[in-house]
A protein has these predicted regions:
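C-terminal structural segments of small proteins and small subunits
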Residues: 56-89
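Compact, glycine-rich, soluble single-domain proteins
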Residues: 9-48, 52-57
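A composition-driven signal for long, intrinsically disordered, charge-rich low-complexity tracts
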Residues: 1, 30, 39, 84-85
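Short amphipathic
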Residues: 1-10
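Conserved beta-strand core positions
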Residues: 4, 33, 59-61
Length: 89
């Protein structure tokens, strides 16, 4: 299991489009990928789970990956968050 803390930096936070991108990205990996915030846990491959976290701009989350390609899954997910979910702002 590997994990990393990140900050949601895009203006709209974890909204539907960002959650969909996250789900599309993480389903490419065999590893389980979870987002954790203040005791809540969300399967990153499930849009509704991600939306339930209500991650707004400035929210700190932990990305956690477990499985055979866990490091690649973590690194790629962190890059997506750092890239503001590829949204222009």
């Amino acid at each position: 299991m590997v994990s990393q803390d990140v900050e949601i930096i895009n203006r709209l936070g974890l909204h539907a489009r960002a959650a969909a991108q996250l789900g599309k990205l993480t389903t490419q990996f065999r590893s389980k990928v979870f987002l954790k915030k203040e005791g809540q846990s969300a399967n990153a491959k499930t849009i509704m789970d991600v939306l339930m976290l209500a991650g707004t701009q400035g929210t700190q989350i932990t990305i956690e990956a477990t499985g055979e390609d866990e490091q690649e899954a973590l690194d790629t997910t962190v890059k997506l968050v750092a890239a503001r979910f590829n949204e222009s702002e």
